[in-house]
Amino acid sequence: MADKFSFDIVSEVNMMEVDNAVNQARKELANRFDFKDSKSSIELNKKDKKITLIADNEYKMKALKDILEGRFAKRNVSIKSLDYKVQENAFEGYIRQTAEIISGLSSDRAKELSKLIRDSKIKVQAQIDGTKIKVISTKKDDLQLVIAYLKQLSFPLPLQFTNYR
């Protein structure tokens, strides 16, 4: 029997599901009555991991966000992975807003998460390893406590628990 157990904490986004969600949002946009005769659009830049929303006015921008977030939810992609930037004026009075798709734990977020695990007083070790955090313990129960603790927190990124050993 192993004397140490571990798992990894990651924050990854399935880009295929994001692509599917954006395509479904485009289809809904084309069929919605309130968007008839509108130049509103949703564009995905896979290379830069950015989604660009263009709308006629504030109301339609809010509706575009609702459509996109609804499709993300249906495809089981966390809305927490979207980081909306500031709205800006586009051509001919239109409004443009960019949403960056966040994938991976930055070093700041990893340190913050590691500190949260240490502050929980559960007897585990948290090691930052690039874009993931490895949590090690001698008891499986402690690892399960850490997972339960992190799930009940409202962390600003979607967290997945992988590589159980």
From Swiss-Prot:
GO terms for cellular component: cytosol. One of its GO terms (molecular function) is nucleotide binding. Keywords: Nucleotide-binding. Transmembrane segments: none annotated. InterPro entries: DUF520, UPF0234-like_C, UPF0234_N, YajQ-like_sf. HAMAP family: YajQ. Nucleotide-binding protein. Belongs to the YajQ family. This is Nucleotide-binding protein TGRD_519. It comes from Endomicrobium trichonymphae.
